[in-house]
Amino acid sequence: MGNSLGCSASGERLVSAARDGDAVEARMLLELSPALARYSTFGGLNSPLHFAAAKGHLDIVTLLLEKGADVNVRNYCGQTALMHACRHGHWEVVQMLLLFRCNVTRADYLSGRTALHFAAHDGLVRCVRLLLADFVPSAPLEDGASSTVDGGECQTNSGSSPCSSLGLKFNESARLRYINKPADGGVTALHMAALNGHFDCMQLLIDLGANVSAVTFPYGTTANLIGAGSTPLHYAAGGGNAECCQLLLSKGASKLTLNCNGWLPIDVARMFGRRFLEPLLSPNSNSSIPAYQPSNYLALPFMSILNIAREFGLLHTVASVDDSDLCAVCLERSCSVAAEGCCHEFCIKCALYLCSTSNTRVEFTGPPGSIPCPLCRNGIMSFTKLPSTPTEGLKSSSALTFCNPCMLNTRSVDSPATISKAEIRRNRVAAVSSELVCPLTCSPFPSSALPTCRCSDDDPCDAIETQDGSEVQSPQPSHCASMEMDKREQQDLDRTSCSGMFWSRRSCHREEQCNAEINA
């Protein structure tokens, strides 16, 4: 049962094309039957979007999303395409999923791991930076004013910022909750990065608010080897990376914290044969701890350019016919945004990739977190759109247009009012979201208790209207019920999964099944 709602020959071909990276085949199939993009798993364990994201096929991921694939669809284990892209380090796929407004806070059914846990486990710092982009606002100028661009000249408008001009809201507590979200056993993303010795990833997480004193829980089975109640310093000591231990100590981690087994970090180091860490972790040690600068991967302009790309489009930027208006980086597309401060102009795609690939190890003029301008080497804190930028936007998928209950209505926005019976039979499950058909075996996991509507108070779901203008009551819950569901989901986000099955045979078997299907 579950998501396996049946299959067809064209569905099998789409799965194979998504797995093998055959963009021509995938495009042909979706042109013949666009509803294929909204199917869930075609009788398997993963959707075509999962296959394409795990393999890093950016063109197929983009094609599926434009054709209406649910960006937050889950597989048999409750994992999203974003988790697969982060697990395999495909940061360009992560970036594309973020442009289609995927939900980064979702956790899988097995252990409560988010995409941030998957990225931190392997030290994929670019993926970590992308996942946190919506939680880190582009800082304003020192005088509290922001600049806009008019006719190529930089002007100052007080009381306005790039984030406020797009109607964005920033919630610091949401960032701290997400970055410190514990998985099964209380393991955070910082624990995972510390255990595997990923210094750059740890530094970025700490700079953005990761708790260096977070402890694992006395229940759960993910941390039995080191012990419950362990801090990231215990994990770094077990991993054996001296630089990671120094970083944690410089940020306030304590050498005297005992875990539930009564072990200090130095005891964990001895158990794992890390004797070279004893002078550093000894409670009586007087060894000097270096002071660390902010992370080289901190990119404050990310939020501004990411939301400009969402609103004004990234994929459909036309080439410029005027050489004077060409982007100085790619020399192909017309300039659409300007760097705040130096006012140099770029196309949206180049500005986005400047933030995605920035690794400021060279000297430049700018505050921490700014990225160097490729033309003048001055620091860029945010981007602003040019007045002449056309509002094209990304082609919305059904997952962005409707919440899950509204997707039960099989009539698409772009489809005609009258639909033949044959088309109804062919597309009878096309609009059913995977969230509505959860596998029965996932019910014991707390993380599977998801609300059926993702609409917020500021962006309610639009009611579907009939041809005569009268509203048709959509099958979404009442406003009070939706608020209660959102509150319940937030409680589920804060509460870790204590299923005790993260490393159990059943959970591992389910995850191995999904991974084996992708790697086949």
From Swiss-Prot:
> What EC number(s) would the UniProt record show?
2.3.2.27
Q: What class of enzyme is it?
A: transferase
Gene Ontology molecular function, alphabetical:
transferase activity; zinc ion binding
Q: Which InterPro entries match?
A: Ankyrin_rpt, Ankyrin_rpt-contain_sf, E3_Ligase-Neurotoxin, RING_XB3-like, Znf_RING, Znf_RING/FYVE/PHD, Znf_RING_CS
Q: Which domain of life is it from?
A: Eukaryota
Its recorded reaction(s) are: S-ubiquitinyl-[E2 ubiquitin-conjugating enzyme]-L-cysteine + [acceptor protein]-L-lysine = [E2 ubiquitin-conjugating enzyme]-L-cysteine + N(6)-ubiquitinyl-[acceptor protein]-L-lysine
Q: Which residue intervals correspond to the ANK repeats?
A: 44-73, 77-106, 111-140, 185-214, 228-258
Keywords from the named record: ANK repeat, Metal-binding, Repeat, Transferase, Ubl conjugation pathway, Zinc, Zinc-finger
The intrachain disulfides are none
Question: Protein name, please?
Answer: Probable E3 ubiquitin-protein ligase XBOS33
Source taxonomy: Eukaryota, Viridiplantae, Streptophyta, Embryophyta, Tracheophyta
